[in-house]
Amino acid sequence: MFAVIKTGGKQYRVEPGMLLKVEKLPADVGETVEIEASLIKDDQGNIKTEGKVEAEVVEHGKHKKVLVFHFKRKKNYKKLNGHRQPYTLIKIKDIKA
């Protein structure tokens, strides 16, 4: 059984027991969150277009640093910026059709 969920402007294919990094969610560690599923396919091959996915928040963190370098030739202009995107690690517990 698997489902397709949409969170943080992205879509993910998830299965029960799977760990997944998504954009930061407003939930505390240990809380259970419900995410809308846009597509669910069960073990018999039946497809449903509505449902919910139950997930547990495992941790909050930041991804690796991404460096952004701005440069203008002949003007001695150099600028280096870094960015670390926050994420939430969730564990998929159950898929409800």
Curated annotation (Swiss-Prot):
It holds the Pfam family Ribosomal_L21p. Part of the 50S ribosomal subunit. Contacts protein L20. The keyword Ribosomal protein applies. GO terms for biological process: translation. One of its GO terms (molecular function) is structural constituent of ribosome. This is Large ribosomal subunit protein bL21. This protein binds to 23S rRNA in the presence of protein L20. Keywords: Ribonucleoprotein, Ribosomal protein, RNA-binding, rRNA-binding. It comes from the Bacteria. InterPro entries: bL21-like, bL21-like_sf, Ribosomal_bL21. Belongs to the bacterial ribosomal protein bL21 family. GO terms for cellular component: cytoplasm; ribonucleoprotein complex; ribosome. NCBIfam families: L21 (TIGR00061).
